[in-house]
């Protein structure tokens, strides 16, 4: 299927981001996986392509407007749900080491498939609640 990515490209330009062809492909794959998995589990109420581009992908990247992302090396997405903003940030800023934390294992199964299908590295999923993860030595003061 041929997707019009104009909304995504224009939104990224506002944040000083220029997407390459691989990143565009990854966003399309992410969208397709999101819609496919959303049929069997509630990941998002927004499934229209243009709405996902704007309300999930572009909004996830809005942090880049106020931060110099080249100076950030690690981040955690607490309560990541369907992977927003963590996955879009990883696609656009591949140098980031990202942890996706969520209390529901079924959402992490979805995210692990997204990570694999998109060929992302330097990103991990962690099952648990924020207050519990903060007490574990492997997570405390690491991000």
Question: What are these language model-derived features?
Answer:
Residues 61-143:
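Conserved SAM/SAH cofactor-binding pocket of Class I
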Residues 23-26, 43-64:
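Conserved SAM-binding loop and adjacent beta-strand
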Residues 4, 30, 52, 77-78:
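Residues at the start of alpha-helices and the adjacent loop-to-helix junctions
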Residues 1-46:
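N-terminal auxiliary segments of SAM/dcSAM-dependent transferases
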């Amino acid at each position: 299927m041929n997707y019009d990515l104009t909304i995504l490209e224009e939104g990224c330009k506002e944040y000083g981001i220029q997407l390459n062809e691989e990143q565009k492909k990854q966003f399309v794959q992410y969208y397709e996986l999101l819609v496919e998995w959303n049929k069997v589990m509630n990941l998002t109420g927004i499934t229209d392509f243009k709405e996902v581009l704007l309300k999930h992908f572009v909004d996830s990247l809005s942090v880049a407007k106020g931060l110099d992302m080249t100076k950030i090396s690690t981040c955690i997405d607490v309560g990541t749900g369907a992977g927003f903003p963590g996955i879009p940030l990883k696609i656009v800023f591949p140098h980031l080491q990202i942890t996706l934390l969520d209390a529901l294992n079924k959402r992490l199964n979805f995210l692990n498939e997204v990570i694999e299908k998109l060929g992302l590295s330097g990103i991990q999923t962690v099952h648990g609640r924020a207050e519990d993860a903060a007490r574990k030595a492997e997570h405390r003061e690491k991000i």
